[in-house]
Amino acid sequence: MPYNPKEIEQWYKENYKYFFGEGDKILIIDTPPPYPAPLWHIGAALSYALQDFIARGFRKLGYKVIFPEGFDGNGIPIEMYLEKYEKIPFGSIDREEYIKKCRQILDSWREKMDKILKDLLLSMDFEHRYNTDDPEYRALTQKTFAELWEKGLIYEAEYPINYCPHCKTAIADAEIERKIKKTKLVYIKFKIKDSDDYITVATTRPELLGACKAIIVHPDDERYKKYHNKIAIVPYYNREIPIIPHKMADPNFGTGAVMICSYGDWVDVQIFRELQLKPEKIIDENGRLTIEPVKGLTTKEGREKMIEVLKQLGVVEKIEEIEHSVPVHERCETEIEIIPMKEFYLKQLPFKEEIKKLSKEIEFIPERYRKNLENWIDSITIDWPISRRRWYATEIPLWYCPKCGYIHVAKDGKYHQPWKEEMVCPRCNTKMVGETRVLDTWMDSSITIYYLIKKYSKILGIDEEGLFNNYTLRPQGYEIIRTWLYYTLLRVYQLTGKKAFDFVVINGMGLDKHGRKMSKRYGNVIEPETLLEKYGADTLRYWFAMEISIGEDYRINEQKIAGIMKFMNKVWNIANYISQYQYRETQNLKPTDEWIINYVKYLENKAIEYIRNFEFNKLARELYRFVWDVFANHYIELTKKRAKNNDDSAIYALYFVFERVLNMLSIFSPGIAKYLAKKLYNKDIEKEKLKYWGKVRLDLLYKGEKLIEFNNYVWKLKTSQGKKLKDPISIEIPKELEIFKEDLILLHNIQ
């Protein structure tokens, strides 16, 4: 029958059962739990195919492989969806009902994504799926909070913090992106006290003038040496502030004189601390200004208002239109403000050097991404703010006694919701007040490997320590090195004293055919279902295997995918051809058969090396060339007449070689490989390991390449002479190909 990918892949899914693999070594893949979404683009989905290549490849090498299915779910994204599409703003309905709606939507998206993962023919453990917003998982997050609280690594303090006015919550540095935006650079004149002179300051934040407590100039800037330690008067507010020489001032920006406002940016915060200036909070938690003449306005509105006020005062020297980089919240792209808030922090500054040292014990693939992690660690200047003023996330497991001040932390390993659970103070018997804040979603996501160790130690009957002492691997995108990877290394080290991973494999990003990132804004998002329906998983996976180079972005090219569909048909047709012959054993191999068997052994030896080095694209490309250009186009053509005459050697070689091909092919295209292996060999090819064959005959491989060259030459010669390929030809067989003489005469009809 003709190749029908839908039927084959449906058969595969119906017969699928998770297989850990066989061997003493264990590889634990910390599968990235994707955040559920209504639209999942093909690049994101295909990253899981790469993880599947790793899982299948290492099973072939004799590892037991833990390859779990998991989904994220905590945090702001679902809350933003509720606000934008369900028209349910945060805080507009009962908290319990709000949480229920979030969960219902997430679960519906998860089912859709689960189907895609299965349609991709992943060898995942679908039976033991986890969600980071399940009570079981959240209970572990809370337990780790309690452990670190007891160790003194978590504390509450009021510090200036990155704050998103839209999401109304604190966020960590790792959640910030930089965007280039147009703005106004306003040149404002400050009068020098007891003088007719003015010093002009250029600023993009005139709305913060009420929080200005100093002006700095560079010590070596000759223009301002006469003003060192003089007093300037803040326009409108008539506040006296010092002019201070400071190396943080950039003489080349604006006028070289810089106004220092409490919470203008992190440089301002640093200088305030250094100079021991008293800060003033003029932005509230709604992102609105709190002092006149801009009271009640957003910072953007206040900016325009203050410019008008300053113009009326005659202190605006000029205004320039510029572009500059501003920090925005990665989730909603709202510009970040810095405001002082009381939040919980996890200590990370004392661990920076330890995590860097630990990371040197991890193998990065590709190696260059190690630097991304190190650069991020070097850039950290504050502890990690881990509390959020939202609802759909893991609750902070604390209760407070309003009478005696006792703080209770839940350490029982159960999931708690303090905002609705009653607790009586064990010291004074007073009703306690439950914490209403939740944890940063990365507090959950950063313990996936920790959770998996605990979960699978029970499933496999291995103690946690023993399982952790095996091999752990983290596959992930480069864009979350600073978040998921760093936070996991930090958290696991704080909890266990161990490195979280032996290997970190960084995948690139799937782009459209023009090299652009897929985005709804560009209208270039390709959904996995579209390509799976059109080409099938085996084809799509094999194209991806050939295309991807680990750590590099790649382009989705349908023309190339369609080309791989032809390859699948070629594999199918080879199987049909072989199936017409009855398998037979023989020890008496003819040279051509010995050559092709030698070749496939050589390829299988290389396959083992490629898998160990995570070079799946090289294996896929070499297997493709072998099947199409060598096995089908040359070997099968050379031996057709012998096989037709039931030659033992030819038929044995056909069966032997194709079984080895299917074994390697099953890493990339498991549906067709499993189906054909079952039909031809009555074997479950997924459970078959790769075999290392030792030394192979390189002289025979060399002669094989010359054999291919000779075949191509003869076919081209016949075509140029207007002959059919079956027509006779008079040509001398090269001496080095004498061992193949019998098959060459039959193939080319050499007279």
Swiss-Prot record:
Keyword field: Aminoacyl-tRNA synthetase, ATP-binding, Cytoplasm, Ligase, Nucleotide-binding, Protein biosynthesis
EC assignment: 6.1.1.9
Pfam families, per database record: Anticodon_1, tRNA-synt_1
Keyword Protein biosynthesis applies: yes
A GO cellular-component term linked to this record: cytosol
Signal sequence region: none
Molecular function GO terms recorded: aminoacyl-tRNA deacylase activity; ATP binding; valine-tRNA ligase activity
Protein's UniProt keywords contain Ligase: yes
Listed InterPro entries: aa-tRNA-synth_Ia, Anticodon_Ia_Val, M/V/L/I-tRNA-synth_anticd-bd, Rossmann-like_a/b/a_fold, tRNAsynth_Ia_anticodon-bd, Val/Leu/Ile-tRNA-synth_edit, Valyl-tRNA_ligase
Known catalytic reactions: tRNA(Val) + L-valine + ATP = L-valyl-tRNA(Val) + AMP + diphosphate
Compartment annotation: Cytoplasm
Family the UniProt entry places it in: Belongs to the class-I aminoacyl-tRNA synthetase family. ValS type 2 subfamily.
Protein's recorded name: Valine--tRNA ligase
Protein's organism: Nanoarchaeum equitans (strain Kin4-M)
